Amino acid sequence: MGLVNSVPNRLKAVTLSVIVPYYNEAEVLPELHQRLTEVLSALPDSCEIIYVDDGSSDDSLQLVESFTAESCTIRSIGLSRNFGKEAAMSAGLEHSRGLAVILIDADLQDPPELIPQMLAKWREGYDVVNMQRTERQGETWFKRASAAAFYRLLNTLVKSDIPENVGDFRLLSREVVDHINQLPERNRYMKGIFVWPGFKQATLPFQRDARFCGETKWNYLKLIGLAVDGITSFSIKPLRLATLLGVLIAGSAFGYGAFIVFKTLLFGEVVTGYPSMMVVQLALGGIQLLSIGVLGEYIGRIFIESKGRPLYLVQSVSEKPATTQYQQLEKRA
């Protein structure tokens, strides 16, 4: 999996780990850190915040490494380059120590103030707490409509029931995290992976805020790529669909051919229709190319998996213990 550096620390276990993957978010990180620490300081639990830098080109990493907190440990993980959000989340999960683990985006669209409610559900015995967006402020109608259509398509194709309008903002128990960390796959669609282990799940509705500042790092091309990853990572039905299309077209062609032969022999009519034949040939050619493309997507993923490269590489790790916890440890020592 990833290249994990061994970092000596004096706090081997905590109740809650909050993972924040980010990429070029220097504008919003100070506000996020302030709101996170305010929420966590009000909790009676031991906490850690794990910031995962996905190869930022601005000063985000240096900014995070300067963060401190009185009530929770601050850990910073810097990846060697931009491996993508799925890899950054995986790095955070592998480095987490909490009995409960929460993933949250850095852009403050997911309110940190909901963390106590998520923990309350976890204490009721739920292993996964999904946060379902009832409203998506700051998003165009096209993005909302396309997201809804994608989730319907995905749940039609895959066996796992991936909740609609649930992003990466969720809570996972230690048991679920440990199972996810054992998965060897490199092409990761985390929304599906979070659901795949199963276990007892709860869903909390919330209103997703608009982005605090800056611009989203996800354009439509990246979203389409993520959608393709989601479908090909959890379903082989597109391959079966190509086979089904082939059978249907071959059957239709055979039936139409038999009809032409029967019509010519019985009525002596001359077969005409050059334009219609061209349309049929072009349609068949398009379907064949589409099927080859679908097959190529799966073969490409097999090729990537077969190389066995690490999902990510860690360039730097730093840690600042919580001031109050550190003082308590010193007194016990």
Question: What annotation goes with each model-predicted range?
Answer:
Residues 2-140:
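Structured catalytic core of nucleotide-sugar glycosyltransferases
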Residues 18, 36, 92, 107, ...:
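Residue-level signature of catalytic and energy-coupling elements of molecular machines
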Residues 2-11, 189-333:
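Hydrophobic helical membrane-anchoring modules
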Residues 73-81, 85-95, 111-193, 209-228:
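Acceptor/aglycone-binding surface of glycosyltransferases and processive sugar-polymer synthases
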Residues 21, 39, 52, 121, ...:
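Histidine kinase transmitter module recognition
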Residues 21, 79-81, 170, 243, ...:
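Short conserved micro-motifs on helix faces and helix-strand junctions that flank
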